[in-house]
Amino acid sequence: MTELAPSLVELARRFGIATEYTDWTGRQVLVSEATLVAALAALGVPAQTEQQRNDALAAQLRSYWARPLPATIVMRAGEQTQFRVHVTDGAPADVWLQLEDGTTRAEVVQVDNFTPPFDLDGRWIGEASFVLPADLPLGYHRVNLRSGDSQASAAVVVTPDWLGLPDKLAGRRAWGLAVQLYSVRSRQSWGIGDLTDLANLALWSASAHGAGYVLVNPLHAATLPGPAGRSKPIEPSPYLPTSRRFVNPLYLRVEAIPELVDLPKRGRVQRLRTNVQQHADQLDTIDRDSAWAAKRAALKLVHRVPRSAGRELAYAAFRTREGRALDDFATWCALAETYGDDWHRWPKSLRHPDASGVADFVDKHADAVDFHRWLQWQLDEQLASAQSQALRAGMSLGIMADLAVGVHPNGADAWALQDVLAQGVTAGAPPDEFNQLGQDWSQPPWRPDRLAEQEYRPFRALIQAALRHAGAVRIDHIIGLFRLWWIPDGAPPTQGTYVRYDHDAMIGIVALEAHRAGAVVVGEDLGTVEPWVRDYLLLRGLLGTSILWFEQDRDCGPAGTPLPAERWREYCLSSVTTHDLPPTAGYLAGDQVRLRESLGLLTNPVEAELESARADRAAWMAELRRVGLLADGAEPDSEEAVLALYRYLGRTPSRLLAVALTDAVGDRRTQNQPGTTDEYPNWRVPLTGPDGQPMLLEDIFTDRRAATLAEAVRAATTSPMSCW
């Protein structure tokens, strides 16, 4: 590879773009010039020529000196924090704080700063340093600067140094089900699992088996077709939503909406449900489009029913709470029904929330916009009800929300938040052991510079929404709050690079919002991770994630040796498997290798991969025998092996244990195969039993296998831990 120009290397360094990285095999990889130029362009920095790079370096320096205050100051409670101000050289600088509660504090102390002044277009700018006191309360405050006739203000965010676990989990462990909600149909749902099903699953697992939470797939909003069907088929992946702040109306239970009782012709709603249920019974995959077509028709009928005065007040309060973001989301949904679901192809007057034609469209389509606002209100009420029921049933946490990494590039958030999302690149992951071609998630990443300029408000709102009706949140690929793999448009995932984020700021804001909500934060920290990152998460009191198949003893013994239970992390959520692998029964049989081989995803010979899978299985069976969870001699059947593996989890010190619902009922089919789109029915696989026959929610409640596994994990989490 051609040596990179020093100016390009320096420019990349200033903007947090890696010029080299260590891959999953430990090999040092140099990033190409084309990738660096594309990443800089996504940050608004032209860097194709030497002149452009030199101009950009000069502009970056000038921008630093022209800014009176930092864009945002994020600090930890109990620590003094120093920051710099820029004023005309020699001019006084009066600095004070205004706290979130309106209180003013003046004890912002100036300290020595001997930096020489800077000539900014003939005006000499001086730099002074100030220190914020260590005793500031948690919250969102402001620091103000006055110098002569000039004034400036910046956000100060004081975050918890340590989040940890809430009092309700003090000294205790908890177990819960990990569920892909869409796959869990009931006899009352509309061909797809919904929020009433979620509430009932929580009630059963808590009251019958002492579960402390239900971890559910991201419930984020998807792009849904309108009456004219202008949109493409519904994107099945819950990890590629149109919006992460708002919720998917597919998860509504129509019959749980209070106004339904006042609908004059309720028989039509019943017929719609019956028809879609019969259609679903004939398929071996989830048909979201048919489910939504029926549900949308019913919801339109209910939306027209007059509401009581009290209900109108509740709706108005919801709209006030959600503000401009709700209006933008509902507007995008109505626009997508009219012009299609790719806002880049809309008329130019509609391609931005503030564009000239948007307000006129809203006026002319007020009912369509209100329908989508109303749907979010109903979702908010049903989510609140599910969480309330879970807690009343005895759960310590209730619903554990799942926050996806990003959003669809053509969707609502990409339209509404386009000023803080990078254009011309997508987020993904470099090659690793299980995805050797890398991954492109087709999502525009946050721009770290714009997040700071906007005081992290879009990110704050996202975390607040995730925790509003949840006792915990799992953040998918939490490593993306430290650095994220950016892939230039049109390039393969192997041709990306890492871009740094202010992890102190982003993790701090997550911790602050979780502290205010009394919630737990679980970071999915699998894959290629810098060694210090897991230590940092632990020091901030966030839980990590451990998957049994990935927990290997890399310090002692040969490769592939299982990590002994007592050496697992305490501050983590542990499970046997994940949605990107087959359920445990399938994994034990080597299904993950055969599936990837059939899809052309292997980079090694299939026999070598199968032999590796057999060796992994043998190593874990030997470990289970070593600790007495399997008897010597006869080979265990699938159910016995799965039960023993989850009992092994119970011997780890992990504070949270997760049981995949697919494992509880003996399912074998993979929910998602990374590296594929239409080649495999990702996120469209309904829950089935070991015989491959569909399993409804009501069947789970009486299933012997599910009860046995639940009780085994319950016993493990309630027994004394010798390693504590």
Swiss-Prot record:
It is found in: Cytoplasm. It catalyses: Transfers a segment of a (1->4)-alpha-D-glucan to a new position in an acceptor, which may be glucose or a (1->4)-alpha-D-glucan. GO terms for biological process: carbohydrate metabolic process. Pfam families: Glyco_hydro_77, MalQ_N. InterPro entries: Glyco_hydro_77 (IPR003385), Glycoside_hydrolase_SF (IPR017853), MalQ_N (IPR048458). The keyword Glycosyltransferase applies. Its EC number is 2.4.1.25. Belongs to the disproportionating enzyme family. This is 4-alpha-glucanotransferase. The lineage of its organism: Bacteria, Bacillati, Actinomycetota, Actinomycetes, Mycobacteriales. The gene is malQ.
